[in-house]
Swiss-Prot record:
Signal peptide: none annotated. This is Factor arrest protein 7. GO terms for biological process: cellular response to pheromone; re-entry into mitotic cell cycle after pheromone arrest; regulation of cell cycle. Component of a complex at least composed of FAR3, FAR7, FAR8, FAR10, FAR11 and VPS64. It comes from Saccharomyces cerevisiae (strain ATCC 204508 / S288c). The gene is FAR7.
Amino acid sequence: MSDQINVLSMQQQQQQQQQQQQVYMSPQAENLNHMYLLVNKLVKQLRENQAEKAKILRNIDILSGSLNKYETSEEPHDTTENIALFNRFLEQRGKAPITEKEQLSNNLDENAKDDVMLGVLKRQNSMLRKSLQESKQVTLESMDLLSYSEDSLNYIVAQLRGNILMHHKETIKLIRQKFQTETIPLEDEEFKMYLENVNGLQKLTDISHTYRLLLRLHAQD
C-alpha cells in the first residue's frame, strides 16, 4: 500500500511539472515575446527619428541664421570668406560646392573678380535656399512619420496589454482545469488508498487481538 502511495505521489509531481511547462511554453507566451521585440524595435526607431528631427531643425536654424545675418548686415562682406563658408556648409550636407574657375585668374581686374564672386554668391544663395526648402520638407515628413510611429506604438501597446490579459486569463483557466481534472482526482484516490490502508491496519489489529485472546484461552485450558 505504501509503495502505491509513493507511486501516485510521483505521478502527481510529474503531471504538475508538465502543467508548468505547458503554461510557460505556450504559443501565447511566444507571441508575447515577439511583441516585446517589436515594441523595442519601434521605440528605438522613434528615438532615431527624434534625433534626426532635432538634427534637421538645428541645420535649418544654422542655415536660416547665416542667410539672415548675411542679408541684413550693413558691414562690408569678405566675399572670399563667405564663399568658402557657404561651400563648407553645402559640403557638410552632401551638396557640391559652387566655384568659378575665373575667380582664380590673375588676369581679371577687380570689378570682373567682384562680378564673378557675386555670381558665385548668387548661385550659393539659390542652392542654400533650395537646401532650406528640402530640409523643411524632410522635417515635415519626419514629423508626420514620428506622429504615425507614436500612434502605432500606442496601438501596439494597447494590443500587447490585451494579449497579456488574455494570456493570464487562459493560463488561470488552464491551471484550474488541470487542478479540477487531474490534481483533485489524484488527491481523492490517494485519500481513498489511505483510508483503505487504515481499515486494513485496523483489521490486522483486530485479528492480532483476537489471536491473542485465543492464545490466552488455549493456555487456560
